[in-house]
Design a protein with these regions (language model features):
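Alpha-helix capping/helix-boundary segments
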Residues: 8-9, 43, 86, 107, ...
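Acidic catalytic patch
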Residues: 41-44, 64-97, 109
Length: 141
């Protein structure tokens, strides 16, 4: 199992410039065939918002977006079942300790609670994950 943040998934639509990041995004995409990816409920809004920004900037078309979303629908991406309300105090504490947004701390909390690596390109979130004792997808053991 992996916790997937929006930045990693969006790299499948908006390719990264760094070769190592491109390879990591491709590895995560390949793992969708046999590995479960877990997301918090906020993931869908974050992905939709980034897609809209990309469309408005002319980086992607609505038809490219539709194809991307159809592929995501086929992927083994599960939404965390617990209510965000149950985790709010932990998310706030993690956000305060690591100077994260509540959104990013939501991913961190989920990865720590599930003991799963966090797949992210957000360097601040990745560092907070390591500091909190979690694992980041792509890090060597």
């Amino acid at each position: 199992m992996r916790v997937l943040d929006a930045s990693m998934a969006l790299a499948w639509l908006f390719p990264r410039k760094d070769a190592a990041e491109v390879a990591l995004a491709e590895q995560a995409l390949d793992e969708l065939d046999y590995e479960e990816f877990l997301v918090p409920s906020i993931w869908y809004g974050e992905v939709a918002n980034a897609i809209l920004r990309g469309e408005r900037k002319g980086l992607v078309t609505a038809s490219q977006t539709a194809a991307f979303l159809a592929e995501l629908d086929l992927a083994d991406i599960e939404t965390e079942a617990d209510s965000p309300k149950l985790r709010q105090s932990v998310v706030l504490a993690l956000a305060r300790v690591h100077s994260l947004t509540a959104y990013d701390a939501t991913y961190l909390e989920l990865a720590l609670r599930r003991g799963a690596p966090l797949a992210t390109f957000d360097q601040k979130l990745a560092e907070a994950t390591r500091e909190a004792g979690g694992r980041v997808f792509g890090d060597r053991p």
